[in-house]
UniProtKB/Swiss-Prot annotation:
SMART domains from the UniProt entry: Ribosomal_S10
The protein, known as: Small ribosomal subunit protein uS10
InterPro entries for this protein: Ribosomal_uS10 (IPR001848), Ribosomal_uS10_CS (IPR018268), Ribosomal_uS10_dom (IPR027486), Ribosomal_uS10_dom_sf (IPR036838), Ribosomal_uS10_euk/arc (IPR005729)
Protein's UniProt keywords contain Ribosomal protein: yes
Gene, per the UniProt record: RPS20
S-S bridge residues: none
NCBIfam families the UniProt entry points to: uS10_euk_arch
Assigned protein family: Belongs to the universal ribosomal protein uS10 family.
Keyword Ribosomal protein: yes
Domain of life of the native organism: Eukaryota
GO cellular component: cytosolic small ribosomal subunit
GO biological process: translation
HAMAP family named among the record's database cross-references: Ribosomal_uS10 (MF_00508)
Length: 128
């Protein structure tokens, strides 16, 4: 009868104790690239994705965002006299987004590549 009164507890798994603290904290990293030159932008995107895949990271992208087209229309004549002739200028801003899942130290190594002139890089790090 004494054996029936003993409460049964399942054995603890020793492999799980302290497992979370020994692993590096994983972050979601979003790298946003923007440029007026598509050629330079695609080169930097390719270098970033290649570097991330070499380190066997989880990569999503590059995602092509809509191109922003900025228009400016001005008169050619500085004095306002004469025929109304107009100049039309436009600037196209191309944007790419790359998402990674890794630790912050690894991202520093990946983003240390040479960035082409005219390419703006924005890195956003958030917890997963």
């Amino acid at each position: 009868m004494a054996a029936a009164d003993v409460a049964y507890a399942p054995p603890m798994k020793s492999g799980k104790i302290g497992f979370e603290s020994s692993q590096e904290v994983q972050h979601r990293i979003r790298i946003t690239l923007s440029s007026k030159s598509v050629k330079n932008l695609e080169k930097v995107c390719g270098d970033l994705v290649k570097g991330a895949k070499d380190k066997s990271l989880k990569v999503k992208g590059p995602v092509r965002m809509p191109t922003k087209v900025l228009h400016i229309t001005t008169r050619k004549s500085p004095c306002g006299e004469g025929t109304n002739t107009w100049d039309r200028f436009e600037m196209r801003v191309h944007k790419r987004v790359i998402d990674l899942v890794s630790s912050a130290d690894v991202v520093k190594q990946i983003t240390s590549i040479t960035i082409e002139p005219g390419v703006e890089v924005e890195v956003t790090i958030s917890d997963q």
